[in-house]
């Protein structure tokens, strides 16, 4: 069946990773925003996602410290299995460079703020960014 999701359990912090190539027309001097698309069978409660990220170029050590962006609790809308979108997670300006790979780790943070029962099903992550103008001579 379609769509396919990654399910995050309610009993322990669980992760999913994605890697995004930072192409030349992205303006890396501007912050980017990430949004998590998800649903849940639960009709009440709050879910909390965190995002960790690091950006690396070819030849750089990928085993370095990541930046953690803690999420805020998002309240379910009261209807089961409805596609929801998280609030924005900021990826800092100058955190990436053109030609880098942005490594993202999305985690359901089952802390005290996350009290939604059952799985949170993640369908994807949207990255919003600013482009640089192209000048051709």
Which stretches of residues belong to each language-model region?
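Extracellular ligand-binding interfaces
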Residues: 43-71
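Short carbohydrate-recognition loop motifs
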Residues: 1-12
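Extended, low-complexity, turn-rich repeat/linker tracts enriched in Gly/Pro/Ser/Thr and Asp/Glu
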Residues: 26-29, 38-47, 57-59, 112-114
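Short coil-to-beta strand junction motifs in C2/discoidin
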Residues: 32, 43-50, 118-122
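Extracellular carbohydrate recognition and processing domains
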Residues: 60-95
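Short beta-strands within extracellular/lumenal beta-sheet-rich domains
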Residues: 10-31
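Proprotein-processing/basic-patch segments
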Residues: 107-137
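Cysteine-clustered segments with highest specificity for TGF-beta superfamily mature ligands
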Residues: 84-112
């Amino acid at each position: 069946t379609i769509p396919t999701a990654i399910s995050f359990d309610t009993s322990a912090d669980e992760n999913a990773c994605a890697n995004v190539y930072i192409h030349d027309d992205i303006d890396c001097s501007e912050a980017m925003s990430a949004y998590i698309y998800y649903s849940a069978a639960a009709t009440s409660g709050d879910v909390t996602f965190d995002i960790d990220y690091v950006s690396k170029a070819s030849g750089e050590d990928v085993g370095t410290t990541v930046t953690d962006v803690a999420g805020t609790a998002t309240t379910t809308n009261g209807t089961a299995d409805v596609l929801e979108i998280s609030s924005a997670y900021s990826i800092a300006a100058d955190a990436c460079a053109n030609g880098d790979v942005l490594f993202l780790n999305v985690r359901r943070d089952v802390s005290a703020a996350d009290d939604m029962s059952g799985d949170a099903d993640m369908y994807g992550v949207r990255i919003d960014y600013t482009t640089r103008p192209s000048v051709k001579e």
